[in-house]
Each structure stands twice: as structure tokens, then as C-alpha cells.
């Protein structure tokens, strides 16, 4: 079997649903991987404590037989998607310190499906690709 950090979303969800691994184990492995490569600047907001707490909650839900498409699957998203729990800059100094009162629809749908956020990923200004 490949290393946890090499699994895609579908494989991680499969492993969690079959109870081959816990969400806490997966989340800890990915946090360690992120910390090992922290110097790359991939994350503008890294939230390992929040992710571990969410993973523990997901493990309880999984243990109770609850099912959701992404229950317990850790992921990260670009800093252009607003969240209630983390500041959003969209890669722009103009938005430094902005805290949204709501989650972007895509973020909310991921959370509703049981996903766990490791944090927000860096991007060029407003993710314009320029």
C-alpha cells in the first residue's frame, strides 16, 4: 500500500469507510507532511489544531456508523474561498486581515460532506493566473 500522503480523495474516503485507518491517523500524517515542507510557502493559513479536532469528531461519527461522501477526509483549498474559521486574503495585501462571516458555497458543501480543512493554500493575487 502507498503512503497516506500519496492517496487521493477517493482512496482516503475508501480507507476511512472500511476502517483501515482513522481520520486522526490520516490527518496527523498529512500534518507531518505539510510541516516537513512548510518552507515552500504552500499554506497561507495552516490550521493543524482545528484539523485534528475535526478528525477526532469525524472518527466518532464514523464509529457510530455515519456515512458521508468525504467524512474524515482532510484537504486544503485555495485562499480565494472565504471561510468563517480562517482569514481570507486571496493573495492580496488589500484583503489582509479579512474575516468572512460565512463560508463560500464550495467550502460549505465540502464541510457538509464531512471534509476536514487543513488550511488555505497560497495563490497569486485573486487567483488570476497572471
Per-range role (PLM):
Residues 1-46, 50-53:
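An N-terminal boundary/leader segment
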Residues 4, 40-43, 58, 94-95, ...:
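Short clusters of hydrophobic/aromatic residues that line enzyme substrate/ligand-binding pockets
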Residues 16, 34, 58, 113-114:
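Alpha-helix boundary/capping residues
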Residues 24-28, 52-55, 74, 107, ...:
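Hydrophobic face of alpha-helices
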Residues 37, 71-130:
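Short glycine/serine-rich loop/turn segments
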Residues 54-60, 129:
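Short, basic phosphate-binding NTP loop
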Residues 58-74:
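Immediate post-signal peptide segment of exported/extracytoplasmic ligand-binding proteins
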Amino acid at each position: 500500500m502507498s503512503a497516506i500522503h500519496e492517496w487521493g480523495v477517493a482512496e482516503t474516503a475508501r480507507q476511512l469507510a472500511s476502517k483501515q485507518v482513522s481520520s486522526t491517523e490520516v490527518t496527523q500524517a498529512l500534518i507531518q507532511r505539510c510541516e516537513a515542507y512548510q518552507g515552500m510557502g504552500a499554506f497561507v493559513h495552516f490550521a493543524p489544531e482545528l484539523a485534528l479536532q475535526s478528525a477526532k469528531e469525524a472518527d466518532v461519527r464514523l464509529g457510530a456508523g455515519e456515512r458521508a461522501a468525504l467524512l474524515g477526509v482532510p484537504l486544503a483549498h485555495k485562499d480565494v474561498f472565504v471561510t468563517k474559521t480562517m482569514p481570507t486574503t486571496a493573495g492580496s495585501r488589500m484583503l489582509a486581515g479579512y474575516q468572512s462571516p460565512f463560508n463560500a458555497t464550495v467550502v460549505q458543501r465540502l464541510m457538509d460532506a464531512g471534509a476536514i480543512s487543513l488550511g488555505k493554500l497560497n495563490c497569486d493575487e485573486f487567483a488570476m493566473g497572471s
